[in-house]
Amino acid sequence: MQEQYRPQDIEQKVQEHWDNNKTFVVNEDPNKEKFYCLSMFPYPSGRLHMGHVRNYTIGDVVSRYQRLQGKNVMQPIGWDAFGLPAENAAVKNKTAPAPWTYENIEYMKNQLKLLGFGYDWSREFATCTPEYYRWEQEFFTKLYNKGLVYKKTSSVNWCPNDQTVLANEQVEDGCCWRCDTPVEQKKIPQWFIKITEYAQELLDDLDTLDGWPEMVKTMQRNWIGRSEGVELSFAVNGEEAPLEVYTTRPDTLMGVTYVGIAAGHPLAEKAAATNPELFAFTEECRNTKVAEAELATMEKKGMDTGLRAVHPLNGREVPIYVANFVLMDYGTGAVMAVPAHDQRDYEFATKYGLDIIPVIKPEDGSELNVSEEAYTEKGVLFDSGEFDGLAFQDAFDAIAAKLEAEGKGKKTVNFRLRDWGVSRQRYWGAPIPMVTTEDGEVHPVPADQLPVILPENVVMDGVTSPIKADKEWAKTTFNGEPALRETDTFDTFMESSWYYARYCSPQADDILDPEKANYWLPVDQYVGGIEHACMHLLYSRFFHKLLRDAGYVTSNEPFKQLLCQGMVLADAFHHTNEKGTKEWIAPTDVTIERDAKGRIEKAIDDQGREVQHSGMIKMSKSKNNGIDPQEMVDKFGADTVRLFMMFASPADMTLEWQESGVEGASRFLKRVWKLVHEHTNKGTVEALDVAALSGNQKALRRDVHKTIAKVSDDIGRRQTFNTAIAAIMELMNKLNKAPQESAQDRALLDEALKAVVVMLYPMTPHASFEMWEALGETDIDTATWPTFDKNALIEDEKTIVVMINGKLRAKLIVAADATEEQVKELGLKDENAIKFLDGLTIRKVIYVPGKLLNIVAN
């Protein structure tokens, strides 16, 4: 073992050892308990960022800890390789997406290896290869044959200038990002998978996910959005078909004063056909894409269609308005409006001078006032005819029953969740395996003709997908008849919805090998960002249930335990230029002055300009405040970067990047290395004789085993990695001060250092590997996690604090089994106690067993 800790000398050597010995390559072993640890796989954007490093370090720490518990641990890695950024980069760099993607994979793979992550590289795959997406295509055709896939027209963002479909992220302020043309909404046929068929099960099974953060489960519950309500019909004057609406508040039915419909509703389209003003308004609504979250705050706009709806119970006629807050994608595309009891309806009614009729009053008898805002609480009905006096649930049931009896409505369960639209009008994705024959019939591509391969040698013009532009590519046959291929590709969430399962058998000649999949699944620990709570995590749960129902897996859920790591923040600095826009300056190009409390007082960039500090914000390219992991590894070594990542903050909280903190982690590792080097240089160590230890030696050994117990619990159960590292640091402070004179001093230090090195191994595997060998052991990768000796925690002596009139005046060392009388006697005889009690009369002596003697005197 070299005297100085120089990571650059050891890390590559240890990584080569892992590669040569295939240390992390695993197979199914029915005799060992398995542990499947997975971090969300990266998109190969070109370089790793600190968010990646944090995510993968957490996963690696958990994996290595579980290995040392004797488990058969699988930790795979791969590449989520399809997606829009590759198309954009290809246009910019005048290349095709495929070579750009594969080059990035090679570069990032090398970065992951330099960080020392213990991956089973034999399981690696990229989702953009036919070997992967072929099985996705086949599974899709199976779902189609089961009736779980369908095609319907749906709205997309359309650029009329480029004649192309835009992804949501390509629409900037309602305009095309490329040519600044106002974007329109266009309806085109798209493919959907019936996730709604599984809505109730997806909701119910959240209750089985005890290892998931409550916040993520709540987000999914809200996203699925189960509600119980009533579906009812309003007759429309002059129309044959009634207007269907869904409401969760049938108790307010007698307060309906208008009906709102979406711009895309058939009634709106029919009315607009003969009304130019209404047509212009519906077009405006259609081309203003509104997120559901914005509905509450946006300006409410509407226009009377001239149509009248007939109230299903009292026969009153109410106007039908096209309203911009009603979305065609939700419910029936129509809402019954009760301004007195819904704030959105209230604002709209106030704006357009519509009636506001209250029908619910507070249950407590307090005065009802709807002069300034709606009364939205549940209460008691009035002015509602036969339903007067009923409270919410009774009114709900009675009104639903009456509607049902008259054939005008029924109780129903509704979900906010919509079927999963998987069509994308992009090139760089897996082709959807469907064909259309000349008679207009749609068919799945037969299994023996899969995969439908995406051509990789293409030219990107930045406007049209190459497979849409190449008319020859789409030409094929079906049962000998001419046919055209589907030129849309899958939503890239398709690939990431089942990748975790493919790792179990990446070479299988089917989507999965059930035997291998059922050995490894479900994933025991999943690590990734909370931003994936409602899309990726929900789609993966859905896909798992589809795989189960197809007979591939036996478990109901894909991920047992979920850890959502916090974001990585860094200082951000900007300079406001002559045009008044902010130029973001990299923190590495800024010299800062701090005040006594460490706050930034002044910041000067490398051009000598004073720049503004914008605070600690998420590392991003746009704010130019990302720190390159490569630079940090080159400067400090992978182990130091990993240690800082795990120590600087709880794993699920934001982490503030401070290079001073990285320097602190480096100093700590050097101290551990130095002590191990000094200890091993003194030669062989005799066996530890626990029975012969002195009082001080026993106390130190107690600290060692208390630390083992705490670190085991912090990493294994609580996942508070930062407190585990803090406990190891605290122990190291004691070991650095411990005597090394006697043979048993050295034997005790040997036991302690071996425990420290193994406990640090999940965070700092390279340094631990070297120190473990120096301590005379072989291959830390197959070592066993230290077990704490319960007997070491038994104390022969206890320290009792003596308080006199609330002030600490003495400390007593007493036998662990000393009685209350013995402690009181020793306390009153203590020379410090005698000094402070001189001239006072003792009024009370209170003993808190094993801790405190409290004397009250005056």
Swiss-Prot record:
GO terms for molecular function: aminoacyl-tRNA deacylase activity; ATP binding; leucine-tRNA ligase activity. Belongs to the class-I aminoacyl-tRNA synthetase family. NCBIfam families: leuS_bact (TIGR00396). SUPFAM superfamilies: Anticodon-binding domain of a subclass of class I aminoacyl-tRNA synthetases, Nucleotidylyl transferase, ValRS/IleRS/LeuRS editing domain. Keywords: Aminoacyl-tRNA synthetase, ATP-binding, Cytoplasm, Ligase, Nucleotide-binding, Protein biosynthesis. Its EC number is 6.1.1.4. A motif ('HIGH' region) lies at residues 42-52. PANTHER family: LEUCINE--TRNA LIGASE, MITOCHONDRIAL (PTHR43740:SF2), LEUCYL-TRNA SYNTHETASE (PTHR43740). A motif ('KMSKS' region) lies at residues 618-622. It catalyses: tRNA(Leu) + L-leucine + ATP = L-leucyl-tRNA(Leu) + AMP + diphosphate. The keyword Nucleotide-binding applies. It is an enzyme of class 6 (ligase). CDD domains: Anticodon_Ia_Leu_BEm, LeuRS_core. The gene is leuS. It comes from the Bacteria. GO terms for biological process: leucyl-tRNA aminoacylation. It comes from Photobacterium profundum (strain SS9). It is found in: Cytoplasm. This is Leucine--tRNA ligase. One of its GO terms (cellular component) is cytosol. ATP binds at K621.
